[in-house]
């Protein structure tokens, strides 16, 4: 074990390098990340071209003159309601000079005013009286008063023009608003008090106060710019959120288990994105300073603000990655929070918020950032330089904002760390909410050695007869002690107990296997032992370290190597880089990292793939890499969860050898689904069932207690008589049973306790050659049978035991079940009649349409994108409607004094001030002052008139009172920043005069605006349709690219093999896609007509557009199909194609707009650009509509031909699709009735390579294949004939000028599969199995040779194959029943027959409970069952099974094997099966063929291959007295001189005996019986080589030179070393 030292710095650096490599190698993601940011930066850079910053110099007082000098009256006055009082008031108003000659009209209500206004040619001012003293003045928008309510502190309120200075505050004065207000106020006062003040109010003068210099931003552009600043880091933050969430979910818990510190994980991502933020903040500060958006504040101020804001967003992304589990949602949530909180920050720009509220809201970093930006704008406005913050100018607020952003960053990080601790991860690991209050969290004291409790010492269940006691030498070596461990998960409705009170020990120096069915709790137990999961109750100690203590867990991480069930690697790193990363995470010393990596690469034979990216590795290579990561650092404890899953036998044996070499002084615990792996590798097996401990012990113990016995396999010739052999066997062993028989083969079960009878039996078998026995072998009961017996299930033996119909099961109900399965499956042979021709074509179309519709229901992203596109079409309508409602409802702003002036006793606060009144009468004006004070206004009075109110802009307004003979005269001075100042001061003066006479009432004036009514437009709705059509032209990629998914999950290939016609596939898709797309058009037209119902003019053109829309739908959908077919091997990229369609359409619209009166150009555009066809038709139709409306000429019929263009496009794309299918599509199984594509027979090419040095069995098979090929008797022909197959692939060039070298996958392979036969095709990765399967299915065309399937040369045509691929070619969201019904329809079964067949198959394979379950919710075993059922559905004569039982537990494998045997036994069908699992081949195959380096190395029955190529027998003995071990070893070497001791575990001794030492078998058993009696053996077993051993022996011949490195990195083998005695 290598010394480890966990270093946060080393881990951080390793993870940081990993993150940089990810960014470099995932160029698409990195490009999008930076491109989005840079595009936003570019938008900010071009800002000066569309925005004007007002740098306004100081301005002296502006004199506006008397209010009655307004004489440019362009409006008439309408008022309501009409009463005596209002009539008197408005008559007085009408007598004013500026309304001379203008009409003042009274109308009864608002509706009457609207009707009058709509037909009146001049501008109208509406006066609406609420009561005598309150009224609304409503001016037309843009006339008489500004449209905005108020100026903001950062916006410009005055502008320099060529001739003069324009201030918006003067609009009220110059456009007549104040004049009309003064006239109405004077009339009200005169009518209600009989006191005329018309002269006083008409003589009021106005002035703008002196203005200081300012720099003002203005308009919506400023807000858009600020919004762009808010989202300036969004691209980085989105990808940071996605990456961190994804890595936390998939890898962090596993890396933590290896010793990763949390701080290293967060630092690695934080430092990476801090660097990105630093660069982006630098660019942003440069752009903002160069564009003069922020003028006076220094570069460092802007840079620090953006830098801290970006860092806070990174911290926020980390926090959300913990609270939100899905990566996409995390990025979306962070973006929405940024936008929402940032937009909330606009309130700081437009409102003066209380300081306490600003501090609280600044805990939201986007708000704090916007607060900082608002402060910078305000500083610019006030001309305060802010190169460096200084308290004297108020810029210390920027320092406070920066502090809050830094505080937010720390707060978000602290919350992220806290929530990560207390929220359970996917394994349920969590800490209590107040964990930080415990002293153990802050100081980890040295722990004391754990002392086993008394109940722990006595709790081991070894005393039970189902548990073998540990050998004496292991007493005291209990490394892992499991006591009363229970694990519960929350379920619906009850809790699920994964483990139930487990109690057992695991010993140092032993390899222990955890066995059990799927869901037994194996992975859960290993997760608990590795620290990933926490038990609900119970305790676990590992080398006296308690898993419940965090300090102990950290210590154990240095001792443990874990290989979880899922592969652990980063796909964007190479094999070496993955190993280096995890070596550093594990704390291997830096100087030893390279040496350790080199060791692992050599031991696992991965040197040749060390520079291959993990994403390019095969499944087996990824598994080997995960195992390599587990053994890094030579750990003392190995916890391996199915470490050899997906490995070929050669690689499995590599792993076994490595574990055997390391077991001394180490603890090795692994789980597996392969019973043979546990049998060979593990010293001790622990069986779990339903979470409970079932039994534990060595193989010999378990086989003796639950095994069936020995299996005697006899290979027979033609003269054999079964009854004679059975009689002979029973003569020696009466309780022997004939367990299975097949053509040329008998298998008997011999009880274990009858081994003393074996010598005489074998002697007689050798002595009677006339019995017809060619050879025989004996094998011990398998651990698989033990497992199934423990589970209470029946089994078929791995040497062909329990061939259905001949099974002698131990239980009657098992026998009935097996026979029933055979009857059910064989009954399907009668259902051979299927429909064909056009009827089948229509049925297939409906089936594919159903699939498309079901898939569409679950394509949420595509539907969401479609919905967003349609919603975008509502934007113009929505904006227009909103704006109309805003102004139709007329913003009403009361001109109250409290807009600008303080109330008495109110604390001063911005922007309110006191009202300054200057007395220049030379006398007392107390009566007026008292009247103004009565309006609840705080006054500052200059009683002596010494001040000039116009020179002091610190006040919002000032009133200067002068004396003019008998009356007062007034001069109003307003601060130019206060937009409504003049109307407010006019009301104050008016109420002051009214109060002097009648103090109990006040006049209230409100200002409003209204919109001018538009005129009807007979073709207005076309604009909306046009906008919608531009958007909907981008919809097809989201609707019609489903075929790419079908291609990638191989569903399309599976459908083709099942007999689907290419045209049926595309028309089935189109049936749904075109309908959906046409519904989009219907929706568009309906919404256009509804929203413009009053403006709609329905003509013949609009009716003709309906079939045009139908043709356009077909055209664009089939155009998308063509694109999907061409780019089927790449990514779907719906968004990119949608954008392309959109851009093309937009440019086409521009072309139409500029050439609408050129008749040829729009027609050419419409014809050449399919996405723009509908737009072109609409343009041309609108042009014809104009002609029909404004011309008396009859419309020409010729332009209507343009509506046929979409149908022409559809025909062109359909023909293109047909050509693509014919040229590049795979071999069709049936003749396509529409595309007219017939099944193509490949041209037979002579194989250039003559076979050399072939095995005699392979030569015989080649002759048999040639004879079958030339046979004219189709009834006797095999169902599969593969003759002289050769397949070459084009290799890659190693250099620009190097010659391309072809890679040969198969070399002159010939074999045939007879009726009723299952032929197993075995071989390592790269041996040529998959290529052979692809040639048979038609996926690959052979370079030479030919394949004939039953009926392809005559007789009944083979219309479909049965194919169970290695990858589950299933649709994730469809249920099991839906899959079965679709494939039944594709294969041509009538509905009634399909229902019967589905019911029978479901019952036979026990799939009733899963019928309504979506495939994505099924276990791997159920998916494999479904694939098998789909392959045999429709009773195909040829079935190809590629790893059919992969991923199944032993029980599921047995069910699958039974189904395979029942399906093909005594039928007209045949099957070709490929597998890595030798037990599967032994269980179901009549013959097996082993491929080596693309050639057939051998072929024949299993027993024949064992006898021919098997070199060893395995001898196991268990002694009672350990003192007998050495004498026994000497005796074995004397009896069997070439015996090689394999292992010795205390009382268990294992030897490998060469065949020549064992023959004759009778003599070998005779010797062993003597040994048993002489040495008082407890038990012994002698069994023949397994098929796996034969396979490995033959596989030594696969050499390195057969393939180049760049063809398939998995094909790297070396000669296995010979076993030494």
Curated annotation (Swiss-Prot):
Residues 480-715, 1285-1518 form the ABC transporter domain. GO terms for biological process: cholesterol efflux; cholesterol transport; lipid transport; positive regulation of cholesterol efflux; regulation of cholesterol efflux; sphingomyelin biosynthetic process; transmembrane transport; xenobiotic transmembrane transport. Disulfide bonds: none annotated. GO terms for molecular function: ABC-type transporter activity; ABC-type xenobiotic transporter activity; ATP binding; ATP hydrolysis activity; ATPase-coupled transmembrane transporter activity; lipid transporter activity. ATP 2 binds at residues 1323-1330. ATP 1 binds at residues 516-523. Belongs to the ABC transporter superfamily. ABCA family. This is ABC-type organic anion transporter ABCA8. It comes from Homo sapiens (Human).
């Amino acid at each position: 074990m290598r010394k480890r030292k966990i270093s946060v710095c080393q881990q951080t650096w390793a993870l940081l390098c990993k993150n940089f490599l990810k960014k470099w190698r995932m160029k698409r993601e990195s490009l999008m990340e930076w491109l989005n940011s840079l595009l936003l930066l570019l938008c900010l850079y071009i800002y000066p071209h569309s925005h004007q910053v007002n740098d306004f110099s100081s301005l002296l007082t502006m004199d506006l003159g008397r209010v009655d000098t307004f004489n440019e009256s362009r409006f008439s006055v309408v008022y309501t309601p009409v009463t005596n009082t209002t009539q008197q008031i408005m008559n007085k108003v009408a007598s004013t000079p500026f309304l001379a000659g203008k009409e003042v009209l009274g109308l009864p209500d608002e509706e009457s005013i609207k009707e009058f206004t709509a037909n009146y040619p001049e501008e109208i001012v509406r006066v609406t009286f609420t009561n005598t003293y309150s009224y609304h003045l409503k001016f037309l928008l843009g006339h008489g008063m500004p449209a905005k309510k108020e100026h903001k502190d950062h916006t410009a309120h005055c502008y320099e023009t060529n001739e003069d200075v324009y201030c918006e505050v003067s609009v009220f004065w110059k456009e007549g608003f104040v004049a009309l207000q003064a006239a109405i106020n004077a009339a009200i006062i005169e009518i209600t008090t009989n006191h005329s003040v018309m002269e006083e109010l008409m003589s009021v003068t106005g002035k703008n106060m002196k203005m200081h210099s300012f720099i003002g931003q203005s308009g919506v552009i400023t807000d858009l710019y600020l919004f762009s600043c808010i989202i300036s880091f969004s691209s980085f933050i989105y990808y940071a959120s996605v990456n961190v969430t994804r890595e936390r979910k998939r890898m962090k818990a596993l890396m933590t288990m290896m010793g990763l510190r949390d701080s290293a994980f967060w630092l690695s991502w934080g430092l990476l994105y801090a660097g990105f933020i630093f660069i982006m903040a630098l660019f942003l500060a440069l752009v903002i300073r160069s564009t003069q958006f922020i003028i006076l504040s220094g570069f460092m101020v802007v840079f620090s603000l953006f830098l801290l804001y970006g860092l806070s967003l990174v911290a926020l992304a980390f926090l959300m990655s913990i609270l939100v589990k899905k990566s996409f949602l995390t990025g979306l949530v962070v973006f929405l929070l940024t936008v929402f909180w940032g937009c909330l920050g606009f309130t700081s720009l437009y409102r003066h918020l209380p300081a306490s509220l600003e501090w609280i809201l600044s805990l939201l970093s986007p708000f704090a950032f916007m607060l900082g930006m608002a402060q910078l704008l305000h500083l610019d406005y006030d001309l305060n330089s802010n190169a460096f913050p200084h308290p004297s100018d108020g810029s210390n607020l920027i320092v406070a904002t920066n502090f809050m952003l830094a505080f937010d960053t720390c707060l978000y990080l602290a919350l992220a760390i806290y929530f990560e601790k207390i929220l359970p991860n996917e394994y349920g690991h969590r800490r209590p909410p107040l964990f930080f209050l415990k002293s153990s969290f802050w100081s980890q004291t040295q722990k004391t050695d754990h002392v086993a409790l008394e109940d722990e010492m006595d709790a081991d269940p070894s005393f039970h007869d189902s548990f073998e006691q540990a050998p004496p030498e292991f007493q005291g070596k209990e490394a892992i002690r499991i006591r009363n461990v229970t694990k519960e998960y929350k379920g619906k409705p009850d809790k699920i107990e994964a483990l139930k009170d487990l109690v057992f020990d695991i010993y140092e120096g032993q390899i222990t296997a955890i066995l059990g069915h799927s869901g037994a709790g194996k992975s859960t137990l290993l997760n608990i032992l590795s620290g990933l999961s926490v038990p609900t109750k119970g305790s676990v100690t590992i080398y006296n370290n308690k898993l419940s203590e965090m300090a102990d867990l950290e210590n154990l991480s240095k001792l443990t190597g874990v290989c979880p069930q899922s592969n652990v690697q980063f796909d964007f790193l190479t094999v070496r880089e993955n190993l280096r990363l995890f070596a550093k995470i594990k704390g291997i010393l830096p100087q030893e990292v390279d040496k350790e990596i080199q060791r692992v690469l050599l031991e696992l034979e991965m040197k040749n793939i060390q520079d291959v990216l993990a994403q390019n590795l095969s499944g087996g290579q990824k598994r080997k890499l995960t195992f390599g990561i587990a053994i890094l650092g030579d750990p003392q404890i190995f916890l391996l969860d199915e470490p050899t899953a997906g490995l070929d036998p050669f690689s499995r044996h590599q792993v076994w050898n490595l574990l055997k070499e390391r077991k001394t002084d180490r603890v090795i615990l692994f789980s597996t689904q392969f019973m043979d792996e546990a049998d060979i590798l593990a010293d001790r097996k622990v069986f779990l069932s339903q979470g409970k401990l079932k039994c534990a012990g060595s193989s010999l113990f378990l086989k003796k207690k639950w095994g069936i016995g020995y299996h005697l396999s006899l290979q027979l010739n033609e003269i054999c008589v079964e009854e004679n052999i059975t009689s002979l066997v029973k003569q020696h062993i009466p309780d022997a049973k004939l367990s299975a028989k097949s053509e040329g083969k008998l298998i008997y079960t011999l009880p274990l306790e009858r081994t003393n009878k074996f010598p005489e039996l074998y002697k007689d078998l050798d002595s009677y050659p006339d019995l017809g026995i060619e050879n025989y072998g004996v094998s011990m009961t398998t651990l698989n049978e033990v497992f199934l017996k423990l589970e209470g299930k029946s089994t078929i033996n791995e040497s062909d035991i329990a061939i259905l119909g001949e099974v002698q099961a131990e239980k009657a109900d098992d026998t009935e079940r097996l026979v029933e399965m055979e009857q059910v499956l064989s009954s399907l042979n009668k259902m051979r009649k299927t429909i064909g021709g056009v009827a089948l074509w229509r049925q297939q179309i409906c089936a594919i349409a159903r699939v498309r519709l079901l898939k569409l229901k679950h394509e949420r992203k595509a539907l969401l994108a479609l919905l967003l596109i349609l919603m975008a079409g509502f934007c113009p309508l929505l904006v227009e409607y909103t704006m109309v409602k805003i102004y139709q409802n007329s913003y009403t702003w009361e001109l109250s004094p409290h807009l600008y002036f303080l109330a008495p006793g109110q604390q001063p606060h911005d922007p309110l001030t006191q009202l300054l009144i200057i007395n220049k009468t030379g006398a007392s004006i107390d009566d007026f002052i008292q009247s103004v004070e009565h309006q609840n206004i705080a006054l500052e009075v200059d009683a002596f008139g010494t001040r000039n109110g116009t020179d002091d802009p610190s006040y919002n307004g000032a009133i200067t009172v002068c004396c003019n003979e008998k009356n007062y005269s007034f001069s109003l001075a307003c601060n130019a920043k206060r937009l409504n100042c003049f109307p407010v001061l006019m009301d104050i003066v008016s109420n002051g005069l009214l109060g002097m006479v009648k103090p109990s009432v006040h006049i209230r004036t409100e200002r409003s605006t209204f919109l001018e009514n538009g005129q009807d437009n007979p073709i207005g709705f076309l604009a909306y349709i046009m906008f919608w059509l531009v958007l909907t032209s981008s919809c097809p990629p989201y609707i019609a690219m489903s075929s790419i998914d079908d291609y990638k999950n191989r569903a399309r290939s599976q459908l083709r093999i099942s007999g689907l016609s290419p045209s049926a596939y595309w028309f089935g898709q189109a049936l749904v896609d075109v309908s959906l797309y046409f519904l989009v058009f219907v929706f568009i037209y309906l919404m256009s007509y509804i929203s413009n119902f009053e403006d709609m003019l329905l003509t013949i053109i609009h009716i003709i557009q309906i079939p045009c829309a139908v043709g356009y739908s077909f055209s664009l959908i089939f155009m998308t199909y063509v694109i999907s077919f061409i780019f089927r091997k790449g990514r779907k990229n719906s968004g990119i194609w949608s954008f392309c369609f959109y851009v093309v359409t937009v440019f086409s619209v521009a072309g139409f707009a500029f050439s609408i009166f050129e008749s040829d150009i729009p027609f050419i555009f419409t014809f050449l650009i399919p996405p723009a066809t509908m737009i072109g038709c609409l343009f041309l139709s609108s042009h014809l509509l104009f002609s029909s409306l404004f011309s008396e000429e009859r419309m020409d019929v010729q332009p209507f031909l343009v509506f046929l263009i979409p149908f022409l496009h559809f025909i062109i794309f359909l023909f293109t699709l047909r050509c693509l299918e014919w040229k590049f599509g795979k071999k069709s199984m049936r003749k396509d009735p529409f595309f007219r594509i017939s099944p193509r027979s490949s041209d037979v090419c002579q194989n250039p390579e003559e076979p050399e040095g072939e095995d005699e069995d392979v030569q015989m098979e080649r002759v048999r294949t040639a004879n079958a090929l030339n046979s004219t008797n189709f009834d006797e022909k095999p169902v599969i004939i593969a003759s002289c197959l050769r397949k070459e692939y084009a290799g890659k060039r190693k250099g620009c000028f190097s010659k391309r070298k072809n890679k040969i996958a198969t070399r002159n392979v010939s074999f045939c599969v007879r009726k009723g036969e299952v032929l197993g095709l075995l071989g390592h990765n790269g041996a040529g199995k998959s290529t052979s399967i692809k040639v048979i299915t038609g996926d690959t065309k052979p370079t030479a040779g030919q394949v004939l399937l039953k009926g392809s040369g005559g007789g009944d045509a083979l219309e479909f194959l049965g194919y169970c691929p290695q990858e589950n070619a299933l649709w994730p969201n469809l249920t099991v029943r839906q899959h079965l019904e679709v494939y039944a329809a594709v294969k041509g079964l009538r509905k009634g027959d399909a229902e019967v067949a589905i019911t029978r198959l479901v019952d036979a394979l026990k799939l009733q409970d899963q019928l309504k379950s979506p495939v994505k919710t099924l276990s791997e075993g159920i998916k494999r069952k479904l694939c098998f059922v789909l392959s045999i559905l429709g009773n195909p004569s040829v079935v190809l099974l590629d790893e059919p039982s992969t991923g199944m537990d032993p029980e599921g494998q047995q069910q699958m094997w039974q189904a395979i045997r029942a399906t093909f036994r005594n039928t007209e069908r045949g099957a070709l099966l490929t597998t890595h699992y030798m037990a599967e081949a032994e269980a179901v195959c009549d013959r097996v063929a082993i491929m080596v380096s693309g050639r057939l190395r051998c072929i024949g029955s299993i027993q024949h291959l064992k006898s021919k190529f098997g070199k060893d027998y395995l001898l196991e003995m268990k002694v009672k007295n350990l003192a007998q071990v050495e004498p026994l070893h000497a005796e074995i070497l004397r009896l069997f001189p070439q015996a090689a001791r394999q292992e010795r575990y205390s009382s268990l001794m294992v030897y490998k005996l060469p065949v020549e030492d064992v023959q004759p078998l009778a003599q070998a058993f005779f010797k062993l019986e003597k040994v048993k009696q002489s040495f008082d053996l407890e038990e012994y077993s002698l069994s023949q080589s397994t098929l796996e051993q034969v396979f490995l022996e033959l596989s030594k011949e696969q050499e390195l030179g057969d393939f180049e490195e760049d063809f398939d990195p998995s094909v790297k083998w070396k000669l296995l070393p010979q076993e030494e005695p």
